[in-house]
Amino acid sequence: MNTLRLIALLAAGALAAAGQVTYERLLNAEREPGNWLTYSGNYSGHRYSPLDEINRGNVTNLEMKWAYQMRSLHKLETTPIVVDGIMYATQPPNDVIALDARTGQPFWTYRRQIPDDVRVCCGQINRGVAILGDRLHMGTVDAHLVALDARSGRVIWDVEVTDYRSGYAVTAAPLVVKDKIIVGIAGGEFGIRGFLDAYDAETGERAWRFYTIPGAGEPGNETWLGDSWKTGGAPTWVTGAFDPDLNLIYWGTGNPAPDWNADIRLGDNLYSDSVIALDADTGKLKWHYQFTPNDPYDWDACQVPILVDAEYEGQPRKLIVWANRNAFYYVLDRVTGEYLNARAFSEQTWAAGIDEDGRPVFRPEMRPTPEGVLVYPGVLGATNWFSPAYSPRTRLVYVSVWEYANIYQPFTGDLPHEPGEFYYGGVPTTPRDDPGTAAVKALDVLTGETKWEFPQHSRATAGTFVTAGDLVFFGNNEGHFMAFDAHNGKLLWRASTGGRVAASAISYRVEGRQYITLPSGNSLFTFGLRE
């Protein structure tokens, strides 16, 4: 038997041995520490692994076990999932690859042809797949949702979410909830009208759609000036969270359009820059909380929600915590959406604070003007889409934080909208003498107080990841992959990957050994303890 045939037979055996991922397995993902079954590791958005074979005492013995270079030259923003020893990862724009999680040996690759006229704001990227049963689900930059056979990469169904020619795309990893695939969309910079969709996992038929901008006559439409709601943005371009006990999906919404010009869309612009809580079965709105009303700065609420059950002021509460792009850390009751507290975690000059009702107190002098106004944080925010992590052991939230400013200048005159074209209302610039700084920060989960921080040379675009070994893993723009003591931020280990890190690490176990995988540059790097 030749080598290639042997490899093919072994691959077929490994793929066949991988178990079906039921909804019950997803509900109990924490009980399967050897797998990484969802984008955030669990429905609560924790990015926490219960594995502790790799820990503070032996992390210096980490070494690279394998690397896999993608064919795409674009940076990876994917979060791989791992199911029973099989890793599934995406590469730009919309390829999926199945790998042996122990060796990096590829099993199959799905390659999708993307139309030449696809336009996206910030790169033709993809952040991952979702699995249910033996099917993988992926959104595409030409605004489709695709179901693939996890054993072969064969297309099972392919449905259009919406018309990409109007500026829509799907870049986020979907979220499986019961028998539905929840899909958000990108395109806020094109003046789209945002929505969140649910699709039947078996057939691909759409089950419900929630528009993040209320239509004419609907509650909330009065928060938009005239017809500005029709091109108001509020996309849903980062994966959300789910509470099965409450049957609520929590999802962040993006900035109102056009960017950097609030005067032509006067009002709060609901439900932009918000967290929305939707009934998982119907898509009906249960509650919302808006972080930045009438946003003139482009501060999407594009962060993964973190759900925490904790005692708050002497009472057990179901909480949702959020380190927002606007530089404030929020604690809300996730049953009702009640605002509980907020604290700035990065330098900010735009607000005098958050009032007792949870509404920001804008500083009038910080509103953008045609002459330009210097405001902290800058247009990309105090943090961005890259995921935070939460450890139930330390009760800390770990966030990649930026400290910098932009000069905001809105355009004057008419701003006509053309479907499929960029819809900008101004321009932000960075002061030459102040490029800004960055850090990994550990925040108290209930107050947002900074407990420790580790400075970075540049504004890193990677998320954090934490383990039961009390290690926080993080990568930066220089390609350094680092492990910190989760309690005090001490740097314990560092390796160079040679590529910009623009994603988060994950951990899993195969044949009794723990591994850590990091997407960096256009490659996957996997580390384990030296044998």
Regions found by a protein language model. Name each.
Residues 45, 49-162, 467:
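N-terminal cofactor/phosphate-binding cores enriched in small/glycine residues
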